[in-house]
Amino acid sequence: MPPCCRALCEDTTVEKQILILLAAYKGGRFIRPMVDSILAQDVGGWRLILSDDGEDTAPILQEYADKYPDKITHYRSGRRFGSAQKHFMHLLEQFGGQADYIMFSDQDDVWHPDKVRLTLRLMEQ
């Protein structure tokens, strides 16, 4: 393995604050695998902001926020955004200044356990 790849793969220390934004819309059937994949990350230092723009995801998002209050926030704006872009922009306005780095997740993503660590290392190069 090349030295640059070895360093990325072996370093599990994260000292930066990372905010992961997830804007969901009628994503009830996708949310659990997505959130579980973030919870399975091999580094800490992240906080997940879950926001929904539809009816079926709110109870699931709240369940996760209640279970993992130190890692997950269920943000309820009370607004309908009409597009993922507007929803994410609103989340950036509300939370963007609270972290060193921001990552975005779609509701139907499933992240590899090393995604946060490897992405952060690449961003810092």
What name fits each language-model region?
Residues 5-125:
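Nucleotide-sugar donor-binding/catalytic module of glycosyltransferases
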